């Protein structure tokens, strides 16, 4: 597959002390969101968004050993279709449907990539990312003349939790200043990150996670034990 020998893959450590680390990380994030100024809030919210996208690489690259350079484009399709076609749906139904759309695009990319890996797979996924950008994001038929779509803020219980609603108070709490982004938008992002991280941890602990690791270690050996290698790769994408 492009090389004479393959180096040994790094050992996949089984998650431990998940609950204490989750609580510690959440508390530290809340301290930054509520206790620091808007620069820190913006940086933390950007970090939380990046974590959600990076978790897909944890599964795809870390568990299955498949190199993908299309994850940002796939995530972009979710946001694009959410803002254009599902913006009227209540939160969190809209983002969930957007995630399913991203899963469909991930599957479309995975099918031609089933028989390659390594650098060749990276080239294929990079080409797919460029194709998605040109056919969807830069297509005025879909994205409009400006190439940008407005996304309505999430509403929970009739309250605007969007990043610009700095006057929002929940339990009498708000940020230390009135400069966007809204601190409670960051809290929503934190909750989503915690849920997604726990889901990835459970995948690692499950039978599916063990199948992923077997495919990463040796595809032929995994197939010999009855694992459907193609299905495992598509599921990871």
Give names to the regions the model predicted.
Residues 1-237:
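Transmembrane alpha-helices and adjacent helix-loop boundaries
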């Amino acid at each position: 597959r492009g090389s004479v020998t393959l180096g040994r893959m790094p050992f996949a450590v089984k998650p431990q002390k998940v609950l204490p680390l989750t609580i510690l990380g959440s508390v530290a994030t809340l301290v930054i969101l509520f206790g620091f100024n808007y620069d820190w809030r913006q940086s933390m919210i950007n970090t939380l968004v990046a974590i959600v996208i990076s978790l897909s690489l944890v599964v795809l690259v870390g568990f299955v050993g498949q190199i993908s350079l299309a994850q940002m484009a796939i995530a972009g399709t979710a946001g694009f279709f959410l803002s254009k076609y599902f913006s009227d749906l209540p939160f969190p139904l809209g983002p969930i449907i957007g995630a399913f759309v991203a899963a469909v695009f991930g599957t479309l990319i995975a099918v031609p990539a089933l028989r390659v890996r390594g650098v060749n797979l990276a080239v294929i996924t990079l080409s797919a990312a460029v194709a998605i950008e040109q056919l969807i994001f830069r297509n005025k038929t879909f994205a409009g003349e400006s190439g940008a779509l407005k996304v309505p803020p999430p509403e929970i219980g009739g309250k605007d939790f969007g990043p610009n609603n700095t006057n929002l108070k929940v339990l009498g709490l708000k940020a230390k200043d009135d400069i966007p982004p809204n601190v409670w938008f960051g809290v929503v992002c934190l909750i989503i990150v915690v849920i997604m991280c726990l889901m990835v941890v459970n995948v690692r602990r499950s039978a599916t996670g063990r199948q992923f690791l077997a495919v990463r270690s040796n595809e032929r050996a995994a197939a010999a034990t009855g694992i459907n290698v193609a299905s495992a790769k598509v599921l990871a994408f």
